[in-house]
Amino acid sequence: MHQLRFRAVVLTIGVLFLSTIDYAFSQTIRVERLVNTPIIRPEMDGRMGSNIAGPSLIRVPDWIENPLGRYYLYFSDHRGLYIRLAYANTLTGPWRTYESGTLQIEQSHFPTSCPPCRDQSDNGNGPGAYPHVASPDVHVSNATQEIIMYVHGRDIGPQVTRVATSKDGIHFDGHPEILGRPYFRAFQHDNFTYALAMPGVMYRSSNGLSDFEEGPSLFTPDMRHSALLKRGNRLFVFWTERNDAPERIWVAHIDLSENWQMWTRSEPIEVLRPEFPWEGADLPIETSQGGAINVPVNQLRDPAIYEENGRVYLLYAVAGERGIALAEVHLTP
């Protein structure tokens, strides 16, 4: 893969776990931006507009016939009415969008108007009451030859997560069951599907499609978008937080060897903050707020992890919600 090399961020995590397993863990993480511009930008087609959030990337499996490209990158508008799709044959692009999109809100089992959906104050006409489907978390199931997509939206009350499935990665069927809180990021561990939701609440299910059980809350109420990287019994969590100035990407880890109800996270370490104009670094530093942002700001949001051939990639939203960028994560013991 052709790669352009830009300034990297180097950090070291050195944390002493204060748990029943008493050991020291040290890991060096280097994050390297691979291109000097977002790979996804506003107005790439006639439908998508300028708000860009929530990336999730897969390698298209061989059992999908006639794919648009080797890679499918799913993303959304923060207040979107459908899940967007971009495709490419190399990770660094060029990326093109599939203008029709994938899962539409009408297929998702989320309300298409408010009311009947309501915001957190139970107001069908309040500022948080808007129909949407957003923040895809997409996985390939080779066992069932399906693409599994977790999405969130506003239900009749709070924001929640549902799941949709597809045989081709484009046409999805939504499932009606509410699985849990919004912003699922899922991973496999000990024959369960686990999911970390906002704000840091863990869930698990025996089949990944239904009956998610709520477990411990591991993060502060300001935690929102997360991404997960599993290494044996250690889970790295990348995330951003409201009320940061600027909003940036953090990392911590969780020891998965204990009973899941006893899991705790390590202290956070900063991974990445805006450093270039296309990331918003030339804009004023302001405290980030919850919800959508429709103008460029000095913020990074929405981390997502993709792994291929032993390499780890980090996607993230730039300048608030103004594009998606690509970096590589280098892990050394």
Placement of each model-derived feature along the sequence:
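Beta-rich carbohydrate-recognition and catalytic domains
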Residues: 25-296, 307-333
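Bacterial N-terminal signal peptides that target proteins for export
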Residues: 1-10
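Iron-sulfur (Fe-S) cluster-binding modules
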Residues: 300
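Bacterial Sec-dependent signal peptides at the C-terminal "C-region" and cleavage site
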Residues: 17-27
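Bacterial N-terminal signal peptides
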Residues: 9-19
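Intrinsic low-complexity, intrinsically disordered segments enriched in polar/basic residues
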Residues: 4-5, 17, 185-187
